[in-house]
Amino acid sequence: VEGALALWGCASARHIRADYYLSQPAAVTETFFMQEDVGGRWLKWAKELQFIAQAGVTYSHDPFDRERFERIRQMAAEMVSGGTGEDFGKVEGLFRQQCGYQTPKLDTRAAVFEEGKILLVQENDGRWALPGGWQDEDQTVYGNTVKEVWEEAGITVAPVRLIALQDHRRRNTPPNLFNICKVFVLCEPVEGEFRENIETLQCGWFGKEELPPLALEKTTKEQIEMCYAAAGDKHWVTLFD
């Protein structure tokens, strides 16, 4: 049996142990839907095996142990390949690209507003998302946010506020092979216009009630609504999972 502690109206949660701490009533629903269905547990197990294998390959000095950890990594890749239909070699290659202690990847997303509408970019598959992507190793959150908007929409922006840090597993579907921390940044447009590039087909400004088909693994309607709320609140407090 798991227990949750309702924090609204609570002076302090110190020394009170619970499986979940709920900051507001809406968190009850969020926590309920966090629970995994049995059919999806194989991906969790595969990711955990990859994590164990990666740490073992990185820190083990015994050649026989390293060989065993490499086999665990192969097993994780076999599980993902069998569960998704993806080519085994491709999956194993993605796993082998990881170096050092494995941590979540950072995905920055810019919320850019103009005249009450939000900027979205159209991916090559026709769906739309907030401009953004993986944070490069040599970039800060600020710099990566600016870079991604420029590359995907041709617009220079000025980041002004951190909206939220979200766990991809709790907010977006389908699940990703790696754990992702999504960083949403409120930005002001400076100048520029769309220019042809290899990542996106076009960009556009959309009202909250006129959203196009979204790439849900990158951007959901709820995340866009969150960005609208942040843009309209000068005293917005950063949200985080």
Positions of predicted regions on the chain:
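Low-complexity, intrinsically disordered or signal/transmembrane-proximal segments
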Residues: 15, 20-24
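Nudix hydrolase/Nudix homology domain
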Residues: 33-60, 66-69, 198-241
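Unchanged
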Residues: 135-159, 167-227, 236-240
